[in-house]
């Protein structure tokens, strides 16, 4: 089993990153490496989808792919690999002969470049979680979706700090826009949240905790 590298959560080993065969969260190295491969396939897809040439299928794969790589969302290697294959097929249908991006280039980049690209990547993953839930309710924002492709393309390019920093800022702005979209999707679908009293007495379990 190959070793892993993952440092996207705040609980990484030694506060520097999980290596070896298992992460602090329980993720195995084979799954971590498959998630890196999936990310590389998403960069390939972003390159294959030119601006304004998105489709429902490419959007769904972009959102699913990014959402899948968030901490504790999917540790099933088989489903991660299956999704990678679907993304690869979508990219091949659009622009054949292009290779997936090697995400190790990000982890091995100079510290400042690695940090800025990681902020973009992890920001896109978090935003994708909001966008995916809004998408499931039928709400899509073209500006948000276009930025997923733009951001993933930039991760696969040789960019300096002066070019990456504005994209980091834009990632934050898009994240806020996506939170607004999800709020609209939820309130228009389910109504406005209402503060409600709940009992605090201890009952016999088991329980499902919902926050």
Labelled PLM ranges:
Residues 1-211:
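Metallocofactor- and cofactor-centric catalytic cores in central/energy metabolism, strongly enriched
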């Amino acid at each position: 089993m190959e070793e892993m590298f993952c440092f996207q959560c705040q609980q990484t080993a030694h506060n520097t990153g999980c290596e070896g065969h298992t992460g602090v969260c329980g993720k195995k190295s084979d799954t971590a490496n498959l998630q890196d491969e999936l990310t590389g396939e998403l960069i390939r897809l972003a390159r294959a989808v030119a601006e304004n040439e998105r489709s429902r299928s490419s959007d769904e794969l972009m959102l699913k792919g990014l959402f899948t790589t968030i901490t504790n969302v999917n540790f099933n290697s088989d489903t991660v690999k299956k999704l990678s294959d679907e993304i690869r097929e979508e990219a091949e249908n659009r622009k054949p002969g292009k290779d997936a991006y090697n995400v190790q280039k990000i982890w091995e980049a100079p510290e400042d470049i690695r940090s800025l690209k990681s902020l973009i990547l992890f920001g896109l993953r978090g935003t994708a979680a909001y966008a995916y839930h809004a998408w499931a309710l039928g709400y899509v924002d073209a500006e948000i979706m276009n930025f997923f492709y733009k951001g993933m393309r930039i991760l696969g390019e040789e960019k300096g700090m002066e070019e990456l920093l504005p994209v980091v800022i834009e990632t934050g702005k898009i994240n806020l826009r996506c939170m607004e979209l999800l709020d609209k999707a939820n309130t228009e679908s389910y109504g406005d949240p209402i503060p409600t009293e709940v009992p605090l007495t201890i009952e016999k379990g088991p329980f499902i905790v919902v926050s």
